[in-house]
Amino acid sequence: MSTNLRKTHPLAKIINNSFIDLPSPSNISAWWNFGSLLGTCLILQTITGIFLAMHYSPDISLAFSSVAHITRDVQYGWLIRNMHANGASLFFMCIYLHIGRGIYYGSYLYKETWNTGTTLLLLTMATAFVGYVLPWGQMSFWGATVITNLLSAIPYVGNTLVQWIWGGFSVDNATLTRFFTFHFLLPFTIMGLTVMHLLFLHETGSNNPTGLNSNTDKIPFHPYFSYKDLLGLILMLALLLTLTLFFPNLLGDPDNFTPANPLSTPPHIKPEWYFLFAYAILRSIPNKLGGVLALLMSILVLFLMPALHTSKQRTTQFRPLTQILFWSLIANLLVLTWIGGQPVENPFIIIGQVASILYFSILLILMPIAGMIENKMLT
């Protein structure tokens, strides 16, 4: 009897155990598609990014015009650039849906997988931030100035740290060069961490909508979920191409079509849509250091999710109180995203402050209490 190379070859064996013969719960829904979509996004962003880097010049006198040159003169440069810019938006859309699924179905109880995933989110946010600076438009320049300046709120070492990151006394050529370096380097770090993320996941196997042990009912990943993932992939690419080909600048900022000018501040400095919720939390606190801490905590709170789980049940599927809180949290995040894009004036200030307090209250106080109440209702 001939041995199956797929199951014996050292390299093929790894791929086989991860993507072909992987035992998967039979009842995982479309919410479990986002992992593969994120992997696809990462590959797509890396490929388009490498092609852009071939034509980009990380110098303040050339950066803006090199991006214009890519979109005008390079073969399909407009397509590569628009796919890279909108691909980032789609990447974050998938990340947020993936995290939302993790919170709803209690996937955070796989602590190692959850912690590597949250670290991946932080790295992706850092990559997106330094990448946004590279076209050297007005919003790139002022976004870099405002966000890096937040570090000056750190007591004692703040100002030194900011100047160290800038490579001078303001955002200048040295800053752009190092941001380009980080933007090129970080995705490969993300890839390494993604492998760890999968490694930890395959130690435990996937969670499922019921939150119960599914060892008695597993099916092979291929063909069932490989085709299901392929459908998700086709839908995602359709959305990406629709954005890229019909509405390439829909999610961008018009200010970034103006070259960076240190002498003229844009009327409203705001980041890309996927950072607006955190930006709203930052702005809702009148104290600089307090704002920076709230901004950090808005993401780092995810690390606390396993410790805040009080329910006897894993998922939110059969927990009406927590369900109400979960969807309130989603609505609250949408409100924060809207507020982040609005000017700092009434009534937006107070709405932002209420939404920020609610965000932390739901995650840190109300959800654990709801879990305990639901436990009481069970007995």
Curated annotation (Swiss-Prot):
Subcellular location: Mitochondrion inner membrane
GO molecular-function term, one example from the UniProt record: metal ion binding
Signal peptide: none
GO annotation terms (biological process): mitochondrial electron transport, ubiquinol to cytochrome c
Residues noted as binding heme b b566 in the record, renumbered to the chain: H98, H197
Cofactor, free-text remark: Binds 2 heme b groups non-covalently.
Any one annotated GO CC term: respiratory chain complex III
Entry similarity comment: Belongs to the cytochrome b family.
Protein name: Cytochrome b
Organism: Terrapene carolina
